[in-house]
Amino acid sequence: MQIFPAIDLKNGQCVRLFQGDFSKKIIVNEDPIAQAKSFAKSGATYLHIVDLDGALEGRPVNLEIIQQMKKAAKVPVQVGGGIRSMAQIDYYLQSGIDRVIIGSAALTDPDFLQAAVKKYGSKIAAGIDAKNGFVATSGWLNISQVSFLDLAKQMEAMDVETIIYTDISRDGTLTGPNLEQMAALQKHVTINLIASGGVSSRADLEALSELGLYGAIAGKALYNGNISMSDIVEVEQSAY
């Protein structure tokens, strides 16, 4: 299982949120470039970067910093936050970003997601952010009436290769991932699934790995020391 250390960017700094609440922001590193380099030096093989400013503004805001992070880390990066157009995807991929995450637009503009997948294939991941099983949009500010399972099935029909599933109610809480929902997703679709939200320990990563998932994202638990980079490396290797 691929494990992605997470770096969330706000105002040029590396931050963590609690349940996606922008008012509950904690700065974990003022230098995201150094953070990316540190993760890679400690064994990270792929980074997950979210442009929170971009998610709010609906356009890439921190691309220059993200480019510097990739250059410093020398590992692949996937980036999400505010990606709403083909021009923005072109912008990221031509700048050396390895995979782009389409979030809210996957629900609000399915034609856009389909066009992106048709053009870029595996370089596109679709994000599903949900609360109590219902899909959220616009930086998690709006909750729809669409089931996460239904949206995943629609994405599979569009030939999406990778879905990143975030349980908002668990994100940044260290309460453990929603194993029931991830298991349901794994049964419902056959594409690559990446779990995000709530990972609090090495045992959580091992439990996700046992579900047969393609990947998992670790954020807050890495920053507060609940999970070490050596834990990540060992779980990744044992899962193959």
From Swiss-Prot:
Catalysed transformations (reactions): 1-(5-phospho-beta-D-ribosyl)-5-[(5-phospho-beta-D-ribosylamino)methylideneamino]imidazole-4-carboxamide = 5-[(5-phospho-1-deoxy-D-ribulos-1-ylimino)methylamino]-1-(5-phospho-beta-D-ribosyl)imidazole-4-carboxamide
Cross-referenced InterPro entries: Aldolase_TIM (IPR013785), His_biosynth (IPR006062), HisA_bact_arch (IPR006063), Isoase_HisA-like (IPR044524), Isoase_HisA-like_bact (IPR023016), RibuloseP-bd_barrel (IPR011060)
Pfam families xref list: His_biosynth (PF00977)
Keyword Amino-acid biosynthesis found: yes
Major location category of this protein: cytoplasm
Record-linked Gene3D superfamilies: Aldolase class I
UniProt KW Isomerase keyword: yes
Keywords from the UniProt entry: Amino-acid biosynthesis, Cytoplasm, Histidine biosynthesis, Isomerase
Active site: D8, D129
Pathway where this protein functions: Amino-acid biosynthesis; L-histidine biosynthesis; L-histidine from 5-phospho-alpha-D-ribose 1-diphosphate: step 4/9
Family stated for the protein in its record: Belongs to the HisA/HisF family.
Entry protein name: 1-(5-phosphoribosyl)-5-[(5-phosphoribosylamino)methylideneamino] imidazole-4-carboxamide isomerase
Source species: Listeria innocua serovar 6a (strain ATCC BAA-680 / CLIP 11262)
